[in-house]
Structures are given as structure tokens and as C-alpha cells.
């Protein structure tokens, strides 16, 4: 809710709670920030499943959000404060062509280019917030796909004011350590019942 924070970018592995964080922030914005919102996903099927299995249950489970939810149609939730929550996929540029949004929530953006086949869906979605350049909130959440050209990897390593990363406590010295590959040590590997030295690929 800090006025100076215009965006949050989350790059993480599988099964690390990214969707839960995204929906929690979306729910907060519905409650505290009147204005048009958009939730985006890579494909139409992913969007349909996310709406049925995550978004609508979230809106029903919370008494506050349930009271704010108005009429719901395909890919659109009308809120009782007069604003809207739109749902859009990277596969369908027509869904976002004429929509201006204040708060944007992007899910698995590294898959957008493959799903769309052409164009730059990530840039297209961000352009939808241009009219709210001083008040917008953009949350980009994705696991990295490919090499350093990954969209989310570039997002978290360029033009970022503050970077946060997980740290774990060393069982020997109890000092917190960043989980970078060069800090992970595998002493022995059990293979076919025998202890062996791990190869670089197995470390």
C-alpha cells in the first residue's frame, strides 16, 4: 500500500507459494484500492482454470471480498465500488485492446511469448496501465524459463530499487546464507546403494 511502490516482481521456482502471494495482493487491492484491475495468464485454458479454482473461491471465502463482489460474467467481475476486475490471456490480444487498468497482476509471464506466438504480450499488458503512471501497481510473478533472456529474470535484475532473496541458516556456523549455486555443497551421493562423488551435473 506504500504510494512509492509501483511494482513487485517475483521470480521463483515451482511450488514456492507464488500464486498464494499474488491472490493475497489482489484481494488486498480489491478491498483497499478502488479502480480497474486485471489478472493475466498465459493461455485461455489456464485462465479459465485459474478463475474457477482460485479466483472465485477466494472471492467467496473472504467475507469482505464477498461483500464487494458484484455480478460475475466470463472474464469479468463487477465490483460494488463501481470498478471492474478483468481477466485476460496472452493468447487473446483483443481482450485487452481497449482496457485501461490501474492494478495489474501477471501470472507466469515467461510463458506469454510462447502462448501468444507473436508480439510482446508482457509489454502490451503493462501499456494498459499508462494512464495511471503515478498510482498504478504492477505485480509480475513467474518462474524463469530459458536463459538470462527470460522476461521475469530481466525484470528482477534490471531497474530494481530493492531486491529481496531467500536465505537459509548454515547448520555449522548458523550464519544466514543466500541460496546461490556456488554455496550448495553435496558431500556424497547414494547411487545403487553405494556412496559416490557427485558429478557437476548432479550437484
Explain the meaning of each model-derived region:
Residues 1-203:
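Phosphate/NTP-binding elements of NTP-utilizing enzymes
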